């Protein structure tokens, strides 16, 4: 069975386009908020997962402080937790809501929040 001339022209074109790199527009996910943001994280992270606990209403700064660079902790050894301003350090970091809900983010930005 021979292919029609139309299919013979379309099949190579489809194969060529499927190998082309995505444009900047297709890599940008747009504004993702709430459930849309969580669903996008599930897709971006896959089996690696990401940190999300819908039962927590407030950010647990004690758990997040464990992820601060060791150098920061060593520089501030002599001070107690209240005076080193862990909350200020965390506020200065760009969060996923600011990055993907208030602004546009890409799939690569989402992958930064995977485990």
From Swiss-Prot:
Residues 60-92 form a propeptide. Residues 1-26 form the signal peptide. One of its GO terms (molecular function) is hormone activity. Insulin decreases blood glucose concentration. It increases cell permeability to monosaccharides, amino acids and fatty acids. It accelerates glycolysis, the pentose phosphate cycle, and glycogen synthesis in liver. Belongs to the insulin family. Heterodimer of a B chain and an A chain linked by two disulfide bonds. This is Insulin. It comes from Myxine glutinosa (Atlantic hagfish). The gene is ins.
């Amino acid at each position: 069975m021979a292919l029609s001339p139309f299919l013979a022209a379309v099949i190579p074109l489809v194969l060529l386009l499927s190998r082309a790199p995505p444009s900047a527009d297709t890599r940008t996910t747009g504004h993702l908020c709430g459930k849309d943001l969580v669903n996008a994280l599930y897709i971006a992270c896959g089996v690696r997962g990401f940190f999300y606990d819908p039962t927590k209403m407030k950010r647990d700064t004690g758990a997040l402080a464990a992820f601060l660079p060791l150098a920061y902790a060593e520089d501030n050894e002599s001070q107690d937790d209240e005076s080193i301003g862990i909350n200020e350090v965390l506020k200065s970091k760009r969060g996923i809501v600011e990055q993907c809900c208030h602004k546009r983010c890409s799939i690569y930005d989402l992958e930064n929040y995977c485990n």
